[in-house]
A protein has these predicted regions:
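Glycine-rich phosphate/pyrophosphate-binding beta-alpha loops
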Residues: 267-272
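Internal nucleotide-binding/catalytic subdomain
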Residues: 151, 155-251, 255-257
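ATP-binding N-terminal substructure of ATP-dependent carboxylate-amine bond-forming enzymes
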Residues: 1-103, 110, 125
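Structural detector of well-ordered beta-strand residues that form the stable sheet scaffold
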Residues: 28, 67, 88-89, 116, ...
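CheY-like receiver
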Residues: 58-59, 107, 129-130, 164-167
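Conserved protein kinase catalytic/activation segment
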Residues: 259-261
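A conserved helix-loop-beta module that forms one wall/lid of the active-site cleft
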Residues: 90-152, 158
Length: 272
């Protein structure tokens, strides 16, 4: 029976475990604690931290592939596992684009993908340049580690924003500023890609955020024109191919009031 190791024992790993049963596969999970959602149901649990290379090695031993229910695994550890012959999917060279928003924006810019204007923020003085380039207010983001609304600031008071920038840079948090998009709603285009380059997509969904967290998913997205839906799916498949993704990936999108699609973020894991 094929064994797939999933790093992380959260709700996404638990749902993946349920799906694996129907496929005749065993999902092994690396969980930090036996109380985590997937650890409560999986028959194959390795306890340890996703930041611990030895724990990752133990979880990967004998597995046909290693994947994730979150993107927080250090890519340097994954590169070591790759060199040791572990099939890390998606590979760390792709995963970095979901971990680091600056890396993502630069690469998507090279690909010509629709996205907001952005600027790296490396000092408080960069706020002035960003304001001239992006307009005001702009969206300040932590380039790494932010999720579910965390690490995102929209502040109209310049002094308050300067304080946030100084505080975050003082904590060694890399920052970027993005143009504030006037969007109608948020969409998500979910795709899967095989090691051989075959791709498939799910219907585009609408996501509703409350307090920065995804609260409701409507599938398929209501009143989405067929051509816009097809464009979102093709965009997601093209990004997956260009980045070398193997596995599943969600492209989180803004639909503007004029019907344009703007890439917000990438998630290289099962996505709810």
């Amino acid at each position: 029976m094929p064994v797939v190791t999933m790093i992380g024992g959260g709700q996404l790993a638990r749902m993946t475990h349920q799906a694996a049963i129907a496929l005749g596969q065993t999902l092994r999970v690396l969980a930090a604690d036996t109380d985590e959602p997937a650890a409560q149901v999986s028959p194959d649990v390795v306890l340890g931290s996703h930041n611990d290379l030895d724990a990752l090695r133990r979880a990967a031993t004998g597995a046909h592939a290693l994947t994730f229910d979150h993107e927080g695994v250090p890519t340097e550890h994954l590169e070591v596992l790759q060199r040791e012959g572990v099939a890390v999917l998606p590979p760390p060279q792709a995963l970095i684009h979901a971990q680091d928003k600056i890396v993502m924006r630069k690469r998507l810019g090279e690909l010509g993908a629709p996205m907001p204007k952005f600027a790296e923020i490396t000092s408080v003085d960069d706020i002035v340049t960003a304001r001239e380039h992006l307009g005001w207010p702009f969206v300040l983001k932590a380039a790494r580690g932010g999720y579910d609304g965390r690490g995102v600031w929209i502040v109209e008071d310049a002094d308050e924003l300067a304080g946030i920038v100084a505080d975050q840079l003082g904590r060694d948090v890399p920052l970027l500023a993005e143009e504030k998009v006037e969007w109608r709603r948020e969409l998500s285009a979910m795709v899967a890609r095989s090691p051989f380059g075959q791709g498939a997509s799910w219907p585009v969904v609408e996501t509703v955020q409350r307090d920065g967290q995804c609260s409701v998913v409507i599938a398929p997205a209501p009143d989405l024109p067929a051509d816009v839906s097809a464009a979102a799916e093709q965009l997601a498949l093209r990004i997956a191919g260009e980045l070398g993704v193997v596995g599943v990936m969600a492209v989180e999108l803004f639909e503007t009031r004029t019907g344009e699609l703007i890439v917000n973020e990438l998630a290289m894991r099962p996505h709810n």
